[in-house]
Amino acid sequence: MLSGVTDDGSTQSGSLIDEIVREGARRMNAHDIVQEPDEHARFAAYLDQLQQVAKADEVDLISHVLSDPDQTMAQSAVLRHLDRRAADLHLDPAYAKWSKAMAQAVIGHSFLTRRLHEWSLFRAITLTLSWRPDDLLAASDWLQLKAAVESSTAAIEILAEDGRTKRIRNTATVSLKRQSQR
């Protein structure tokens, strides 16, 4: 398990990234390590650590993952974490506090910021809170497709008519038909 993190991002036994890599390597057998590039080992280790991180340490760990020199890999690991946590929390009142903390952690990473915003929009649609149809229509294909499958009738109707892609429109149309058969 990770040891305490100091202000400069290091731990008692070295940098947090080095410690995560060592932890990931420890969990893999030697044959896998030889064949797998470093960024793959770090990615697996990051996912493992993000899966297990305590709520109080989540922002710090995300910040450290995002400081990895391989930004594509680091952001991918954080994206998976955000999607997993948001899927678990979006119907819960705790989501608001969590999403604010995550927004601070991902400042400067536009794709991650947008994904958090889209999770908040999905939450608003699902819980029938205030939301604007134009925001849904301007959202990514990812959110439109997700909303076409598992959101409010109002959102699904909008997407059946004006969804960005044929796939989104067709998925929304099928969802509406299923809802009417219930």
Where are the model-predicted features located?
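Alpha-helical scaffold segments
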Residues: 2-182
